[in-house]
Amino acid sequence: MYFKILIAASLAANFLPVNAENEYLANAESMHPASAVNGNSVSRESVFADSSKVFDIDEIVVVSQPKETRRLRQQALSSSSLSSFQIHKLGVHDLRELSQYIPNFVMPNYGSRLSSSVYVRGIGSRVNSPSVGIYMDDIPVMSKSAFNLHNYQLSRVDVLRGPQGTLYGQNTEGGLVRMYSRNPFNYQGTDVKLGYGSRSYRNFEVAHYNKVNEKTAFSLAGFYDGQNGFFRNSFTGERADKMNEAGGKLLVKTRLNAGWDVDVLANYQYVDQNGFPYGRLDLATGNTDRPASTFAGIYRRNNLISGLRLTRQGNLFDFTSVSSYQYVKDHMLMDQDYLPADYMRILQQQLQNSLTQEFTFKGKQAVGGFWHWTLGAFFSQQWLKTNGPVFFDEAMTAPIGNAIQSQMYNAMVQAMADRMIAQGMPAAAAQAAAQRAIEQAGGVGMEVSMGAPGLYHTPQSNLGFYHESLFDLSSSLSLTLGLRYDYMLTSIHYESSAYMSMKANVMGREATYTLRSMLDGRTHDHFEELLPKLGLTWRLDSHGSNVYAVVSKGYRAGGYNIQMFSDILQTELNANRQNAMRGDYDVPHSADDYEKVNKTISYEPEVSWNYELGTHLNLFENALHLDLSAFYMQVKNQQLSVMAGNYGFGRMMVNAGKSHSCGIEAALRGQLFNGHLDWMVNYGYTRAVFDEYRSGEGAEAEDFKDKFVPYVPQHTLSATADYRIDTDCRLLHSLTIGANVNAQGKTYWDQANSYSQNLYAVLGAHLDADLGKVLISFWARNLTNTHYNTFAVDNAATGNKEYFAQRGNPFQCGVDLRFHF
């Protein structure tokens, strides 16, 4: 039975070719636990004779790798992999949940599906350029806004830590995630999943896999996922994080003559949710209140990832072409102050179209018996239009209007009183008389309205050429040399403005004056980078154990902060407020002003060097796998997400001088009791600190040297254990009892390290009953109802700094039913 195939997720060395189509084993892994290809059950004994061994996913789930010439644990890198079976056991549905079981890899669960921050080894950001690349069936996901997807019907997920720029280019400085769909040539039938749980969690999936003939196969899948949410807005009374999402995907694989294969992929998803359930954080007690914003945040997204993959296996080399078109259209509305009082809100609407093309050539056989090579070229073009107005509401505009009204009233009273005093009236009497005269005439009133609309076009072009060679210097020693040339052209056309409309009522007479500041400009920049890689691997034994050392360069592209415009323009309005008291006034801008604006909104590329030592050990006749690595990274021009300006209208990217990070990663996986107990333990430690970083100027400058880089957990820990009990019952084939725990912290929330989240742990469990064609899974998460924050932020919308946080999800339980026929 399939439950006896318990696979360790770390990848051991073996000697099958990377492109081998080991269909029988791939079928066995991908299958529903009680199912088999064409209805025939597959037992572990029919696949591997020794049930005490831990086997690699590379041995079970074989996927085509157009670039690498070695399996993951034969390479000089730190990695983790999970099969569909392990993903099911952990109950994960997206990369946020998956990251809880990967050392030094964190994608916090907060905000909405728009939130896609990933932090690896001290590298990461909340906005703009991502630190990690994501590939879906060899297609690079181009929009960071599309990273946070619902993942389903996958056969395998690989997570590579450390810079992967040589083969995968910019924005893979922290690492790379590769996701693979099930292959309909290897796996057939129909899968149905039904799930329901507390908080009205609901999930439905259906997928059909059909091998039409020896040359054509296809799969068609769809899903719906939703829940009422965990948090209720204490001000509005509605759910602050309810969500509904749905989607479908199609994969058609065709094997043509002359060694050509054609794959067509389309993956569409739609999400509609309430988001950003941030409550006030009390730094003294560490308690986080329920959300209490003026209205519930909203996020909606349409996302399409489509691609065409052509491959040809030749006698001398393999050729791969991957083309893709990607589309993202979303809508986000957020209460930017997170308070019941209506200070300000931000609307963001993105429309992005992307095209990518990549050609890869990989040597079929070692040249001279020792030289393995890969070379290729990559091109992408992105068009992004962002509509991002900021609205300032009554809680902010009323005090401004009152202040102006008070100034006008006092000036009028004083002017009238001075004339009366000049005519001989006592000062006190003159003041009182002037006040009565103004009030009798209708008084003085002032209404202020403010806004900051903005439309931004930010196209990007990227071109890369790469080569990597692997030399077998001896039967034990291998040398890897790689180099990539990367070129980036980025530009921005901004049409941004801010206005302050002042409607004055002065002694019965009304007048409206408008103060405007408008910016309409263009600028562009380009960046070039060489991304080298040098690695050595020493094979220790015939079981695939090895040690390695690698030096590689990472790179994140520079760009422009559209979040800065609201603060720039608001500062100009405040400076020119008096000019609008005499009539409409438009703030003028010179060429020098535009040059300063262009400099203010730009940020530089981030560059890092990674030095790493590690080992992949297969111990006790492959009964235990140990992966261990130690790394040191030097980062220059570190990109850091901070609040924009004095008021905190949004996030912007700044370059934080220099930083460094160091740490270790360890993964243990094994089996006991003749394969009935499957377990794993992962641990990661990261110490990421600033070496040079000063914020502000003059007396207000702050020095953050030796402060910890924010949002990076210092420790990540996870462990799982699953015990299978076989039965002789015809109805119940087996029971699997499992438990898991994940922990992380300490995490600082700002560059000053003034507030943080301590180390916390979350416990989960599941019970799976294998009934043959049906699998019933009972599950629970956060069994101890641990209180912790997944995210925290501060702003000064009220004029004083306020702190807010999102709490982690509390206890939840449910049941899933899986059918295969």
Label every PLM stretch briefly.
Residues Y24, E45, V54-H88, S115-S117, ...:
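N-terminal periplasmic "start-of-domain" segments of outer-membrane beta-barrel proteins
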Residues K362, T374-G376, S380, S475-L479, ...:
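Gram-negative outer-membrane beta-barrel transporters
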Residues G189-D191, Y196-Q227, F231, F235-Q273, ...:
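Transmembrane beta-barrel wall of Gram-negative outer-membrane proteins
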Residues L95-L98, S117-G122, Y135, N171-K193, ...:
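N-terminal periplasmic accessory domains that precede
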Residues R232-E238, F276-A292, D335-M344, F391-P453, ...:
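Solvent-exposed loop segments that connect transmembrane elements
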Residues D137-P163:
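Short acidic/polar hinge/loop motifs at secondary-structure boundaries
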Residues I60, Y555, G675, N742-D750, ...:
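C-terminal beta-signal and adjacent terminal beta-strands/loops
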Residues R309-G314, D318-M334, N546-V550, Q563, ...:
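Membrane-embedded beta-barrel scaffold of Gram-negative outer-membrane proteins
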